[in-house]
Amino acid sequence: KKEARDRGLWNLFLPDSDYGAGLTNYEYAHLAEVMGRTHFASEAMNCSAPDTGNMEVLVRYGSKEQQDEWLKPLLNGEIRSAFGMTEPQVASSDATNMEATAELVDGHWVINGEKWWTSGAGDPRCKIIIFMCVTNPENERHQRHSMILVPMDTPGVEVKRMMHVFGYDDAPHGHAHMKFDNVKVPYENVILGEGRGFEIAQGRLGPGRIHHCMRSIGAAEVAFELMCKRSMERKAFGRELARLGGNFDVIADSRMEINQARLLTLDAAWKMDKYGNKVAASEIAQIKVAAPIMACNVIDRAIQMHGGAGVCQDFPLASMY
């Protein structure tokens, strides 16, 4: 991290900002792909999720007090953060179903509810959660929710368990199942204002999807390279694996699919820069589907080409998948 910062490779993700490198979404997308080639690059350059999205929220929507208390240490890499949106009892594809609540009592928010897949909450450096919940149930359905800053050490905040993905717990970062029991924070901890949670979410999730998709493309490129290397070095029945069955077709399909996903994602990034997140909503939705499907397909093919080695610790393919 120190070397990355000394070289100016720090907070590269913040577009049009005095805090970062001033890169556009399109420009940063290429860097995100390179960072996706290894699991620690984003961490080294202070460009890890969910901190990137949380910092963008605080830059765009946070008050000066919120920025001084939480944005500055995040930008300096001194602390980590979490994002709490998904809940265990409702369909996460429809966030208007959210059940967690915050009630205003004597100038404080009293928060109750559960969240899971709370990204970043397992990191011991995590000090703050951006928590989305219902604050104004009487409003129109997309104006009922707010985002509130909740310090991790607030009484009533409990990490119930860490969620595993295919057996991997993503330590030391991780995704937590959390409970919030009468958690009390000042009214001033609400970001932007009451009922503006969805407005913030749309601003937050667009750039994050560019980052995630391009990192997935970077990972797919690594899997592709490993697949090509293995297919030419490994022999069966006197021939290289690449020359058996339809393996050349598998390699060719992977090359085309990676290129297609990259171009689709870069198009979305360009459109966000030129016209804004709202106009680019369709393209952002497309890449959220296309890039992960492509990455899963390419990594799966690479695993198959490696045989048993593909699912063991000797190669990164299993954890990438």
Q: Which functions belong to the PLM regions below?
A:
Residues 1-42, 46-48, 61-66, 73-78, ...:
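Alpha-helical interface subdomain recognition
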Residues 23-25, 93-96, 121-126, 140-144, ...:
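Short glycine/proline-enriched turns and hinge-like loops at secondary-structure junctions
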Residues 48-55:
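Short, conserved phosphate-binding/catalytic loop or strand-edge motifs used
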Residues 55-61, 83-84, 138:
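Flexible, glycine-rich active-site loops centered on histidine and acidic residues
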Residues 77-86:
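A short, Trp-centered hydrophobic/proline-enriched beta-strand micro-motif
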Residues 91, 116-123, 207-211:
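Glycine-rich phosphate/pyrophosphate-binding beta-alpha loops
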Residues 97, 155-184:
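Flexible, small-/acidic-enriched active-site or ligand-binding loops
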Residues 107-108, 112-160:
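A short core secondary-structure module
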